[in-house]
Swiss-Prot record:
GO terms for cellular component: small ribosomal subunit. Keywords: Ribonucleoprotein, Ribosomal protein, RNA-binding, rRNA-binding, tRNA-binding. Part of the 30S ribosomal subunit. Contacts proteins S9 and S11. NCBIfam families: rpsG_bact. Belongs to the universal ribosomal protein uS7 family. This is Small ribosomal subunit protein uS7. GO terms for biological process: translation. Pfam families: Ribosomal_S7 (PF00177). It comes from the Bacteria. The gene is rpsG. PROSITE patterns: RIBOSOMAL_S7. It comes from Cupriavidus metallidurans (strain ATCC 43123 / DSM 2839 / NBRC 102507 / CH34). One of the primary rRNA binding proteins, it binds directly to 16S rRNA where it nucleates assembly of the head domain of the 30S subunit. Is located at the subunit interface close to the decoding center, probably blocks exit of the E-site tRNA. GO terms for molecular function: rRNA binding; structural constituent of ribosome; tRNA binding.
Amino acid sequence: MPRRREVPKRDILPDPKFGNVEVAKFMNVLMLDGKKSVAERIVYGAFDQIEKKAGKAPIEVFSVAINNVKPVVEVKSRRVGGANYQVPVEVRPSRRLALAMRWLREAAKKRSEKSMALRLAGELLEAAEGRGGAMKKRDEVHRMAEANKAFSHFRF
């Protein structure tokens, strides 16, 4: 964290094909070693697959999937009197989006389809329907928060 002044957030340019900032952000999450063209190919390939399989607009499927996977609450560790408590806290909007994208990426990586584009398409379609690995992760985080509701008075 900087000591002098707050570092301004950089604006992300929308992606070239759909003109959507969230898609561009997701490409950045997927990107490895600065290879943006590879990330673009994966995302656009996944969108083509979504259009073939579902027959819906891929942008709509993507935004529904992202909104379904976004967590509302999570737990943070808080040390009180020699004991660590998992305290449920509300997730701020920017972190919600970041977590949703990260979980979608990880769930897609764990799938068994041949190419990453196919895996991502499958995961996005499942997340849009409320199933899949990313949704499982979101539900797990929500369950943890629900189980530790008793410690919610230890706010940060």
